[in-house]
Amino acid sequence: MKPHIVARINGEPFALVQHDVRLELRTPGRANLTTKSPSALRGLVTLDLGYNDKALHRHFVGYVERCTTANSQEQVLLCREVAAVLDYPLPMALRHVDLRAVLVEVSRVTGLRFRVPDAPYARVRVPYFYSLGGGVQAMDSLAQVFNIPDFIWHQQGDGEVFVGRWADSYWGVRPALQLPVELFDGYQGNHSAEIASLPGLRPGAMINQGQRITAVTLTGTQMVLKWKKP
């Protein structure tokens, strides 16, 4: 079966010629899209993936960072997930804050929406939170500042950014996905393989014997998965 991919810019569908979409844990994803369009394109980009008449799953939410004209009828788009705003400098000096208060400030500056579980570490207050680097560095530092075990942060399919312990995430509260051996088209080392596209599969998912997906690359009708043992 061939997957059904629906691509939109600012809510309007557009024809895809080819696509390469790369999602990772703790790093904003990116997409290279070639589209049918005689003129340059800008704005919010979404990609939904599904099979036949099944419900579509949102695979990518981002924006056009750069548009290059390939020929008179095609444009090449370099897109980033909305969380890519965290690549920019994000200095902060906050006093007497908990995890949610830090993320409220990040949201105020970046416009991002965060999802934080109702867990003890989310209620711990620290004397100060200090960061002079970029947003990614600030997000990574949350694990140590708030003593969060098995910490992850990543953009979800709905555009929100989950922040917390992996076990409290969408995938952490679900059993491992059992992917049959025949689904894998080829292994690329001990921690990577190519499979037919699976709608809804994203970094953070756990498969088979506890392997945790760290990266998903969607190209054409195939996905390349990378994983690690936690």
Predicted regions and their residues:
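Assembly/oligomerization scaffold segments
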Residues: 1-84, 190, 195, 213-226, ...
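Short beta-strand/loop turn elements enriched in aromatics
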Residues: 1-25, 107-110, 159-186
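Short, solvent-exposed secondary-structure boundary motifs
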Residues: 6-14, 52-58, 138-148, 170-175, ...
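Amphipathic, non-transmembrane alpha-helical segments in extracytoplasmic/periplasmic proteins
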Residues: 33, 94-114, 130-155, 204
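Extended Gly/Ser/Thr-rich low-complexity repeat segments
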Residues: 42-49, 87-98, 202-208
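Short beta-strand-centered interaction patches in the first periplasmic/extracellular domains
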Residues: 74-82, 118-187
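Short acidic/His/Gly/Ser-rich catalytic and metal-binding motifs that mark active-site loops
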Residues: 86, 115-117
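A conserved acidic, glycine/proline-rich C-terminal tail/linker
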Residues: 178-211
